Amino acid sequence: GIGIINLAFFLAKNDTNYSNPNLNLIDEYAEAWSYYLIKASADLAIEQGACPGNNETKYGDGITPNQTYKKDVDDLVPHTERMDWTGLRKQLSETGIRNSTLMALMPSETSAQISNSTNGIEPPRAFVSVKQSKDGVLKQVVPGFYRYKNKYELLWDQKSPEGYIKIMAVLQKYIDQGISVNTS
């Protein structure tokens, strides 16, 4: 599945953090991410045909993840559809989807290294991390360090995982697979 990387940087540059997150911002971001992934796969189905077993998926029935999430999350962020979900659901019902599953949130260590991003949806453990692979040792500094160093929240500075858990709850509204959550 396609995941999210660099969430810590996104939070820092938007003046929010894991302990006291702007859940409306997270909701808006995750909704657009999910919508455009589903839309791209639905458009591919028009070009190349729907995936085998499309009629056995929720997508084939025109059902999207933001219709099946645990509604208790609405207590954190009221449900709002900013994107044209009605049109997308109609398209899914008519032409199907090319990929039966699209989204999964995992640590994304390799992708983060290649793109000089923070790991997936996780808070950084330090401003500089040392990562080792078969190719050698890599020292990686969080993106935008000089500009956002006072905005980043490091994992060990969190007093409680409550804000992090709330972020994960909001993200799950838009995901069709799973989330790898770490509450170190």
What label would you give each PLM region?
Residues T16-S108, I179-N182:
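Internal maturation/activation junctions in enzymes
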Residues V77-R82, Q91-R98, M103-S184:
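Catalytic alpha/beta core of large soluble enzyme barrels
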Residues I5, K39, T86, M168-A169:
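Residue-level marker for well-ordered alpha-helical positions
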